[in-house]
Amino acid sequence: AEYTTSRELLEGMAELAHEYKQPVYLHLAETKKEVEECKMRYGMSPVQFLDSIGLFDYGGGGFHGVWMDETDRNICREKKVSIVTNPSSNAKLASGIADLPALKKAGINLAIGTDGPASNNALDMFREMYLAAVLPKLKYEDAAVMDAADILKMATTGGALAMGLPE
Protein backbone atom coordinates (compact mmCIF):
# COMPACT_ATOMS: atom_id res chain seq x y z
CA ALA A 1 0.00 0.00 0.00
CA GLU A 2 1.11 3.56 -0.62
CA TYR A 3 0.78 4.46 3.05
CA THR A 4 3.01 1.62 4.29
CA THR A 5 5.73 1.95 1.66
CA SER A 6 8.24 4.73 1.08
CA ARG A 7 8.22 6.73 -2.12
CA GLU A 8 11.69 5.38 -2.92
CA LEU A 9 10.54 1.78 -2.60
CA LEU A 10 7.45 2.44 -4.71
CA GLU A 11 9.63 4.07 -7.38
CA GLY A 12 11.90 1.01 -7.23
CA MET A 13 8.85 -1.20 -7.73
CA ALA A 14 7.90 0.88 -10.77
CA GLU A 15 11.43 0.51 -12.18
CA LEU A 16 11.23 -3.26 -11.78
CA ALA A 17 7.78 -3.33 -13.36
CA HIS A 18 9.23 -1.47 -16.34
CA GLU A 19 12.36 -3.63 -16.51
CA TYR A 20 10.38 -6.86 -16.50
CA LYS A 21 7.24 -5.47 -18.17
CA GLN A 22 5.09 -6.80 -15.32
CA PRO A 23 1.92 -5.60 -13.59
CA VAL A 24 1.92 -4.47 -9.96
CA TYR A 25 -0.62 -5.47 -7.33
CA LEU A 26 -1.13 -3.67 -4.02
CA HIS A 27 -3.68 -2.42 -1.53
CA LEU A 28 -5.21 0.74 -2.96
CA ALA A 29 -7.62 3.44 -1.74
CA GLU A 30 -8.84 1.21 1.07
CA THR A 31 -9.62 3.87 3.67
CA LYS A 32 -10.66 7.49 3.64
CA LYS A 33 -7.70 8.27 5.93
CA GLU A 34 -5.27 6.69 3.45
CA VAL A 35 -6.58 8.88 0.64
CA GLU A 36 -6.60 12.06 2.74
CA GLU A 37 -3.03 11.49 3.98
CA CYS A 38 -1.76 10.74 0.48
CA LYS A 39 -3.33 13.98 -0.74
CA MET A 40 -1.54 15.83 2.08
CA ARG A 41 1.81 14.15 1.22
CA TYR A 42 1.71 14.30 -2.58
CA GLY A 43 -1.21 16.55 -3.50
CA MET A 44 -3.05 13.67 -5.18
CA SER A 45 -4.89 10.45 -4.42
CA PRO A 46 -3.05 7.14 -4.06
CA VAL A 47 -4.19 6.05 -7.54
CA GLN A 48 -3.01 9.31 -9.08
CA PHE A 49 0.30 9.28 -7.18
CA LEU A 50 1.12 5.67 -8.05
CA ASP A 51 0.24 6.33 -11.67
CA SER A 52 2.45 9.45 -11.69
CA ILE A 53 5.51 7.38 -10.76
CA GLY A 54 4.74 4.78 -13.45
CA LEU A 55 3.64 1.98 -11.16
CA PHE A 56 0.61 1.13 -13.30
CA ASP A 57 2.25 1.35 -16.73
CA TYR A 58 1.90 -2.43 -17.15
CA GLY A 59 -1.47 -2.72 -15.45
CA GLY A 60 -2.04 -4.70 -12.29
CA GLY A 61 -4.52 -4.69 -9.49
CA GLY A 62 -5.69 -2.64 -6.57
CA PHE A 63 -7.12 -4.43 -3.57
CA HIS A 64 -10.16 -2.70 -2.04
CA GLY A 65 -10.65 0.45 -4.19
CA VAL A 66 -13.19 1.84 -1.74
CA TRP A 67 -12.30 5.55 -1.91
CA MET A 68 -11.85 6.30 -5.61
CA ASP A 69 -13.13 9.28 -7.55
CA GLU A 70 -13.83 9.58 -11.26
CA THR A 71 -10.23 10.52 -12.06
CA ASP A 72 -9.00 7.43 -10.19
CA ARG A 73 -11.48 5.22 -12.01
CA ASN A 74 -10.41 6.63 -15.38
CA ILE A 75 -6.75 5.92 -14.58
CA CYS A 76 -7.57 2.35 -13.58
CA ARG A 77 -9.55 1.79 -16.77
CA GLU A 78 -6.88 3.32 -19.02
CA LYS A 79 -3.98 1.51 -17.31
CA LYS A 80 -5.87 -1.80 -17.02
CA VAL A 81 -5.69 -1.86 -13.23
CA SER A 82 -8.27 -4.33 -11.93
CA ILE A 83 -10.01 -3.59 -8.66
CA VAL A 84 -10.36 -6.53 -6.28
CA THR A 85 -13.10 -5.85 -3.75
CA ASN A 86 -12.81 -7.37 -0.26
CA PRO A 87 -16.21 -6.62 1.28
CA SER A 88 -15.89 -8.61 4.55
CA SER A 89 -12.58 -6.96 5.35
CA ASN A 90 -13.94 -3.53 4.48
CA ALA A 91 -16.96 -4.14 6.72
CA LYS A 92 -14.91 -5.53 9.62
CA LEU A 93 -12.49 -2.58 9.52
CA ALA A 94 -15.24 -0.02 8.75
CA SER A 95 -13.32 1.06 5.64
CA GLY A 96 -16.44 1.73 3.59
CA ILE A 97 -18.33 0.11 0.74
CA ALA A 98 -16.62 -0.05 -2.64
CA ASP A 99 -18.67 1.68 -5.33
CA LEU A 100 -18.82 -1.38 -7.55
CA PRO A 101 -21.53 0.03 -9.85
CA ALA A 102 -19.40 3.13 -10.58
CA LEU A 103 -16.29 1.00 -11.10
CA LYS A 104 -18.23 -1.30 -13.45
CA LYS A 105 -19.69 1.68 -15.34
CA ALA A 106 -16.15 3.08 -15.74
CA GLY A 107 -15.16 -0.12 -17.55
CA ILE A 108 -12.76 -1.42 -14.90
CA ASN A 109 -12.27 -5.16 -14.54
CA LEU A 110 -13.63 -6.19 -11.15
CA ALA A 111 -12.76 -9.21 -9.04
CA ILE A 112 -13.56 -10.45 -5.55
CA GLY A 113 -11.02 -11.30 -2.86
CA THR A 114 -10.96 -12.17 0.82
CA ASP A 115 -8.02 -10.06 2.07
CA GLY A 116 -6.01 -11.71 4.83
CA PRO A 117 -7.00 -13.55 7.99
CA ALA A 118 -6.20 -10.57 10.23
CA SER A 119 -8.96 -8.57 8.58
CA ASN A 120 -11.39 -11.33 7.63
CA ASN A 121 -12.42 -14.11 9.97
CA ALA A 122 -13.72 -16.53 7.35
CA LEU A 123 -11.85 -16.30 4.01
CA ASP A 124 -15.05 -17.62 2.43
CA MET A 125 -15.49 -16.65 -1.23
CA PHE A 126 -19.22 -17.39 -1.17
CA ARG A 127 -19.65 -14.92 1.69
CA GLU A 128 -17.58 -12.38 -0.24
CA MET A 129 -19.77 -12.88 -3.31
CA TYR A 130 -22.91 -12.37 -1.21
CA LEU A 131 -21.57 -9.18 0.36
CA ALA A 132 -20.33 -7.87 -3.00
CA ALA A 133 -23.90 -8.33 -4.23
CA VAL A 134 -25.82 -6.84 -1.30
CA LEU A 135 -23.66 -3.97 -0.01
CA PRO A 136 -24.00 -1.91 -3.20
CA LYS A 137 -27.77 -2.42 -2.97
CA LEU A 138 -27.70 -0.75 0.46
CA LYS A 139 -25.42 2.03 -0.75
CA TYR A 140 -27.59 2.82 -3.78
CA GLU A 141 -30.93 1.85 -2.22
CA ASP A 142 -31.53 -0.16 -5.39
CA ALA A 143 -32.09 -3.92 -5.27
CA ALA A 144 -31.09 -4.33 -8.92
CA VAL A 145 -27.82 -2.37 -8.93
CA MET A 146 -25.56 -5.47 -9.01
CA ASP A 147 -27.06 -8.69 -10.32
CA ALA A 148 -25.98 -12.31 -9.93
CA ALA A 149 -24.28 -12.35 -13.34
CA ASP A 150 -22.11 -9.36 -12.33
CA ILE A 151 -21.03 -11.10 -9.14
CA LEU A 152 -20.37 -14.45 -10.82
CA LYS A 153 -18.23 -12.71 -13.44
CA MET A 154 -16.26 -10.89 -10.73
CA ALA A 155 -15.64 -14.16 -8.87
CA THR A 156 -14.54 -16.10 -11.96
CA THR A 157 -13.37 -14.44 -15.17
CA GLY A 158 -12.86 -11.09 -13.43
CA GLY A 159 -10.45 -12.76 -11.03
CA ALA A 160 -8.68 -14.57 -13.86
CA LEU A 161 -8.27 -11.33 -15.81
CA ALA A 162 -7.02 -9.55 -12.69
CA MET A 163 -4.28 -12.17 -12.39
CA GLY A 164 -3.41 -11.93 -16.07
CA LEU A 165 -4.89 -15.32 -16.94
CA PRO A 166 -6.97 -15.92 -20.05
CA GLU A 167 -10.72 -16.18 -19.57
Predicted regions and their residues:
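Generic beta-structure capping elements
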Residues: 65, 86, 132-134
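A short linear-motif detector with a strong N-terminal bias
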Residues: 40-42, 89, 131
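Histidine/acidic residue-rich metal-binding segments in metalloenzymes
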Residues: 1-82, 94-110, 127
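His/Asp/Glu-enriched, well-ordered alpha-helical/loop segment
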Residues: 52-59, 101-167
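A generic "cationic amphipathic patch" detector
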Residues: 37, 75, 89, 96, ...
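Short, acidic/turn-prone active-site loops that include or flank metal/cofactor-
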Residues: 30, 87-91, 116-118
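Short N-terminal secondary-structure initiator segments
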Residues: 67-84, 151-167
